[in-house]
Regions:
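ABC-type nucleotide-binding domain
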Residues: 1-232
């Protein structure tokens, strides 16, 4: 936005239904990719295509219909859980409940007084971090998006819940292309493809095993987070 080039020489493609993990140090350009996808700003060079179409040729409303997104700074507003998930889209209660179940939010919602009618405080301050993330995930999944973008949005989930969520995405959203932006390799190592960013450039692109064997940046992140342990 200020004239500084944030990303350079980024070139990759994804097939429908594939999962892409994006990892890199803070400031490497991970979240900029999301902003470009949503056309919060456009690339100065090159193109971004969805189904073969340059996204600059799409009406903004049409473009946004492709996506279900959970960003780091997404907020919950002071209203019921149901309305926070619905987000003005007029889904049926059954659709809301299904989205909550898929996002692993059903169990904790059922334990709340009034359940889906439970009133949240501003920013969801009366929920835990993991609960807030699951409500936001419910919002994203409710629209059954063609492209799901999760920007470090499962960081507060425990391992078991994260694993269940991955299984749901694999089984029930098999045709949805998923982009996972994460700080932890454990959150993306199961992705079909992983994009490694360093200072706005593509340092590596491949699956976990390939990058672990060939990419120095990925190896450094991995060993720094695991102490060198090999986690399948």
């Amino acid at each position: 936005p200020d004239g500084t080039t944030v990303l350079k020489e980024i070139d990759f493609s994804l097939d429908k239904g594939q999962t892409l993990g994006i990892i890199g140090a803070t400031g490497s350009g991970k979240s900029t990719i999301v902003r470009l996808l949503l056309r919060l700003y456009d690339p100065t060079n090159g193109q971004i295509r969805i189904n073969g179409r340059d996204i600059r040729s799409l009406d903004p409303a049409e473009l946004h219909q492709y996506f279900g997104i959970v960003l780091q700074k997404d907020v919950l507003f002071a209203d019921t859980i149901e309305k926070n998930i619905d987000f003005g889209r007029r889904f049926s209660k059954e659709q809301i409940e299904e989205a909550a179940a898929r996002a692993q939010a059903k169990e904790f919602i059922q334990q709340l007084p009034q359940q889906l009618a439970y009133e949240l405080h501003a920013r969801g301050s009366n929920l835990s971090g993991g609960q807030k993330q699951r409500v936001l995930l419910s919002r994203a999944l409710a629209g059954e998006p063609q492209i799901l973008v999760l920007d470090d949005s499962a960081s507060a989930l425990d391992y078991q819940t994260d694993a269940k969520l991955r299984q749901v995405l694999k089984q029930q959203f098999a045709d949805t292309t998923t982009i996972l932006i994460a700080q932890r390799i454990g959150s993306i190592q199961h992705a079909d493809k992983i994009l490694v960013l360093e200072n706005g450039r593509m340092s590596g692109f491949g699956d976990h095993a390939t990058l672990l064997a060939t990419n120095t940046i990925y190896q450094e992140i991995y060993h720094g987070q695991t102490g060198g342990r090999i986690n399948a």
